[in-house]
Amino acid sequence: MERLKLGKIPEHWCIRLVAMLLLAIIFLPSTFCDIGSVYNSSYETVIPERLPGKGGKDPGGKVSYMLLMQGQKQLLHLEVKGHYPENNFPVYSYHNGILRQEMPLLSQDCHYEGYMEGVPGSFVSVNICSGLRGVLIKEETSYGIEPMLSSKNFEHVLYTMEHQPVVSCSVTPKDSPGDTSHPPRSRKPDDLLVLTDWWSHTKYVEMFVVVNHQRFQMWGSNINETVQAVMDIIALANSFTRGINTEVVLVGLEIWTEGDPIEVPVDLQTTLRNFNFWRQEKLVGRVRHDVAHLIVGHRPGENEGQAFLRGACSGEFAAAVEAFHHEDVLLFAALMAHELGHNLGIQHDHPTCTCGPKHFCLMGEKIGKDSGFSNCSSDHFLRFLHDHRGVCLLDEPGRQSRMRRAANCGNGVVEDLEQCDCGSDCDKSQCCDENCKLKGNSVCSTELCCFKCNFKKEGDVCRPADGPCDLEEYCNGTSAACPSDRKAQDGSKCHESFLCFNGQCMDPTFQCSRIFGHGSRSASDYCYTSLNSRGDQFGNCGSSSQFPKKYTKCSDKNVMCGKLICTEVAFLPQIQPNNLLLQVPETEDWCWSVAVFDMRDSLHEEYVKDNTYCGKDKVCKNSICEDFTPFSFPCSPSKQCNKHGVCNDLGNCHCSFGFAPPDCKEEGTGGSVDSGPAVNLSNDSSPGPNSTQSSTEELILNLKLIVLAVILVLMILLIIICIISAYTKSETASEAGPSELEELPEGEKEEQEEVLPEEAKGEEEELEYGKEEAEEQGAVEEEGAEEANEEAAAEKKDEDEEEGEE
């Protein structure tokens, strides 16, 4: 009876409610405050006043503004820059896993450069479309200016940009297509004439820019804003490259809107190689370019940028990568110009190089905003041109080459007016034909919210959550597009003590599982201490970039932030020949570490990631365990989401099932305003042809649990009724039957009761038969006795008669 308690019925609901409660608790953030402020100085509100041209005429390509700056009137004289329509380049992004060509709404002739009247050495570079946005340099101080979005009076914010005055760049990779140690060559007079002629002509670098997912999120996950920001950066970079009579022309932009297709580790040298492999495989042949640069959003290790020396115009090494983890646009533009300089054959400056009145030469290892190319840079660049490595720079980009490419049906990319593009597999496609048109009644093709050529139902999950820091997205029933990928707000709690960053839980066990497979986990404190205190390739807190490498031992407080140490390893990964695995015995298991020398290997995440928990109120930063300063966000799960949801990376609530966005206060089906409706429970009698009432996996699961609970109740009731009935029968049988049955357990009673009728019947028949035989035997014996008595009486009578006669 104990195994059939009714208490089991609500256990499924209890487990489900506890799971939902734990989910809410996981994402409950602490009190956060901002740790990522880029600017540490004053702000002021200004109202730029555009001045009319002389005689009220438009000067054409020139404009002047007056603004009150630090209590003084400043007159800005600006002139349009750029010879080509600024919006005539393809912009690629990903939607539901499909590469598409975007058509952002961008204005032409927006970038202007100039100076402040009466301020020697001043410089202004701004975008004047929709207000002024850009950089002003006055008396060696950099200012940023941008419009206030909510202002009705053309108000702007003007702020100083003093944070991070310089960034660094290491020695460029050795496997670039040129040797970095060529000695100076003696030049013939004819060579000098050629070089002089080349120098007098403007060179054009056709640059393709890629923005990684994290940087895209830092720009608000907004494609138009990202495109505009990249254009501003290119405009500022041109203010540096004009020092070598070179103009950067943006020929294309790709934004990794749904995640990075390559590994983007902290080590930018590794990122550069990964990006170059991707460029050769995915970009070459799609868009013509002289160089391709990747902009990443995370804080790197030692250096802010990496580039292949002399890589421009080559098919193999025309790549560079820069980290833009702050918001100092001018400093980043200087970094991009520096890395581009490496692509153009310009090496780092030495102490004898000069660059006029500038504090920093642009090609020094330390890069500042107030910097320029040196005489050494010019010499290196001329040598690059002389070696015919820069022939592609002499071709002036024509308007036709800058225009958006017409849709190329059959390349697998949905472009311009194409309805679909089945690539080379059109014969297998049920929805798309070889002309990139939808077949028959098809309304969609390969999108995430498309199923059998029709829209998926409203509320269907189109992108499931990928881990505890990711959020589900749902189809709306009227479109094939899945909403953009949304993550949990940075700083949200995951796995008790860890934090979410960029949609990933900073739990080292996740890193171990990516290397050693399912079941492996982050090792014990003993393993981290014993290995990371060694200071060798298997345990350290960093290494030098020189060869041979020198490794830094981890101090006691930093051992959890060095090399990733794993345990409970059941499967060994396949590794490149130059890489090594080390196992060290622990008390109950093994400590595993990896040493990676071939960066193409999948093991390159060999260090504990930044923002990983390393102690109470501490996280790892560049292999150092630092104090963690909580974030400050406008969205709080306990306030804005009423404790019934979590905050996403846009600051909106993602509600739990049972509550409705935007504030999770009213009853609903979950989801958010960004992720789509979780499920449609409305009773609309006139749904669209492809928008029907449906339920999500969550509702189906709950319905299954309800049905299961009802079945269990019925089964338990039936079993109880059967047991009671059997028990009653056994009690009745025990009163009439032998006493031994009363002593038997109930289960044996039932079996005995089933056996008794057959056995009892046989015994009864035997008893009756024996009784009849006994009765018959008795009757025979009694009859024989009577006959004997009669014979004896007769004999006695005869004897008496004989005696009488005598």
From Swiss-Prot:
Main localization of the protein described in the UniProt heading: membrane
Membrane-side (Cytoplasmic) residue stretches: 726-806
Binding positions (Zn(2+)): 338, 342, 348
Annotated ranges, domain Peptidase M12B: 203-397
Pfam families the UniProt entry points to: ADAM_CR, Disintegrin, Reprolysin
Limits of the EGF-like domain: 631-665
Positions with biased composition (Polar residues): 680-694
GO molecular function: metal ion binding; metalloendopeptidase activity; metallopeptidase activity
Enzyme class: hydrolase
Compartment(s) where it occurs, according to its Swiss-Prot or TrEMBL record: Membrane
Record's bilayer topology term: Single-pass type I membrane protein
GO annotation, cellular component aspect: membrane
Tissue expression from the record: Testis.
Signal sequence annotation: 1-33
Catalytic activity, EC: 3.4.24.-
Segments for region (Disordered): 169-188, 668-694, 735-806
Any single GO BP term: proteolysis
Domain Disintegrin stretches: 406-490
Catalytic residues, chain numbering: 339
Biological role: May play a role in spermatogenesis and sperm maturation.
Complexes and interactors: Heterodimer with ADAM2/fertilin subunit beta.
This protein's name: Disintegrin and metalloproteinase domain-containing protein 1b
Annotated source species: Mus musculus (Mouse)
Gene: Adam1b
